């Protein structure tokens, strides 16, 4: 299998892009092989006309088919919470198909759930090297640097890289908006939340984020309006994955309502 990647999309590390004025092509090839570790023995890397070509040595069709069956089983094991079994299966898949981005990203997710942040980051870094347009890898990297490593500048770097390829992805925009709010860049956070809601009008996380932003910046009435709009759009029975954010939205509404009524009664 051959993979072609523009040099401009090569990331040399957290917050570091390929720079032709600083990095030679030989350095990039060495970096890529080092990033892939033991996998580099199964691949050839070359650069021509500003494009990296990675050629993976294909396994036999029988081995590939067996690996794909293991991938399906690994996903099932992970969904059922059998993380150690899923870990072994994903690794087994990647021994045969090292360029399988979905398997590698899922492996990173398992590492995250097991608390192995460094391994999760390593696998996601390879995902991005294989496919610089893999949206979920940028989201996960941004989340790692936001929640675990607490480096907001690097988190911003990954969200922005993701948005270069997927400017209208709702989850990327929402996570970036939350990061901007945490950094105190309220105007940009507001723009991002609103853009997300224009793209995904029934996305509870962005309603909650925007409402929280208005509360933090001293606009409780605007916050209440946003939450009321969410409640109108909210399905009668919230999906399980959205139930928590809906509950938080109701609690936030009650808190703001109580605060505004208290101020009104005082005056």
Language-model features: where?
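Helix-start (N-cap) detector for alpha-helical repeat units in TPR-like alpha-solenoids
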Residues: 67, 101-102, 135-136, 170-171, ...
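Alpha-helical segment of the N-proximal tetratricopeptide repeat
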Residues: 63-102, 106-113
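Structural signature of tandem alpha-helical TPR/SEL1-like repeats
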Residues: 79-88, 113-126, 147-161, 183-195, ...
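TPR/TPR-like (Sel1-like) alpha-helical repeat modules
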Residues: 204, 208, 212-238
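Long, contiguous interaction/recruitment modules in multidomain scaffold/adaptor proteins
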Residues: 1-69, 79-80, 85-88
């Amino acid at each position: 299998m051959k993979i072609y990647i523009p040099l401009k999309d090569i990331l040399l590390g957290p917050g570091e892009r390929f720079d032709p004025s600083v990095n030679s092509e030989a350095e990039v090839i060495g970096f890529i092989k080092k990033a892939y570790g033991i996998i580099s023995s199964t691949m050839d890397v070359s650069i021509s006309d500003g494009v990296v070509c990675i050629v993976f040595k294909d396994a036999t069709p029988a081995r590939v088919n067996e690996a794909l069956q293991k991938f399906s089983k690994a996903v099932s094991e992970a969904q059922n919470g059998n993380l150690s079994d899923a870990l072994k299966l994903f690794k087994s898949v990647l021994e045969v198909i090292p360029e399988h981005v979905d398997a590698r990203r899922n492996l990173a997710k398992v590492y995250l759930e097991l608390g192995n942040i460094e391994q999760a980051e390593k696998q996601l870094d390879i995902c991005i090297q294989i496919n610089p347009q893999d949206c979920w890898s940028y989201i996960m990297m941004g989340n790692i640097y936001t929640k675990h490593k607490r480096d907001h500048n690097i988190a911003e770097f990954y969200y922005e890289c993701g948005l270069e390829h997927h400017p209208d992805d709702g989850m990327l925009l929402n996570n970036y908006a939350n990061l901007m709010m945490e950094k105190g860049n309220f105007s940009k956070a507001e723009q991002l939340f609103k853009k997300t809601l224009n793209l995904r009008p029934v996305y509870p996380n962005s309603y909650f984020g925007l409402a929280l932003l208005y509360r933090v910046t001293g606009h409780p009435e605007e916050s209440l309006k946003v939450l009321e709009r969410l409640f109108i759009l909210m399905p009668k029975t919230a999906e399980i994955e959205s139930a928590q954010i809906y509950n938080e939205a109701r609690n936030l509404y009650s808190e703001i309502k109580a605060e505004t009524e208290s101020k009104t009664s005082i005056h």
